[in-house]
């Protein structure tokens, strides 16, 4: 009823405004910066675990073959999806040694999109919101 009362020009402008507003949201959820055709596994120490929306983050301190360390930012899904997979805000604590598998960044920097994690006592966690194995 409301749409039929609108002038065609107003309706077109409103539709265009909605379409333009949707582009940033789609870009925000893009995973184009990750190479989903590859996986990299690193062992490191949890520096920080951020349980936040819209994405949680793990920051791992990882040593290379020469003993040089780098901080690996690893992007996960949001808390809602992680909860359904058995995660909690206390799953990871600073100082915990873990093995993480990620889809690496395409640009070659350290970091990536979370695929799976092996905790110190052997339990493996995956994130279904990034199509990770369970």
Explain the meaning of each model-derived region:
Residues 13-22:
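Bacterial N-terminal signal peptides
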Residues 76-84:
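Short, structured beta-strand/loop micro-motifs enriched in basic residues and often containing a Trp
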Residues 1-8:
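N-terminal secretory signal peptides that target proteins for export/translocation
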Residues 26-40:
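Short boundary/loop segments of OB/S1/cold-shock single-stranded nucleic-acid-binding domains
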């Amino acid at each position: 009823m409301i749409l039929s009362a609108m002038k065609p020009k107003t309706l077109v402008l409103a539709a265009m405004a909605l379409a333009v507003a949707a582009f940033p949201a789609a870009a925000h959820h893009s995973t184009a910066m990750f190479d989903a055709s590859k996986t990299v596994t690193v062992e490191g120490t949890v520096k920080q675990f951020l349980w936040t929306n819209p994405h949680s983050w793990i920051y791992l301190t990882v040593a290379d073959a020469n003993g040089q360390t780098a901080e690996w930012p690893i992007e996960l899904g949001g808390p809602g999806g992680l909860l359904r997979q058995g995660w909690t805000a206390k799953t990871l604590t600073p100082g915990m040694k873990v093995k993480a598998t990620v889809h690496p960044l395409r640009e070659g920097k350290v970091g990536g999109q979370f695929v799976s994690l092996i905790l110190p006592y052997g339990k493996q966690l995956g994130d279904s919101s990034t199509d990770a194995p369970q």
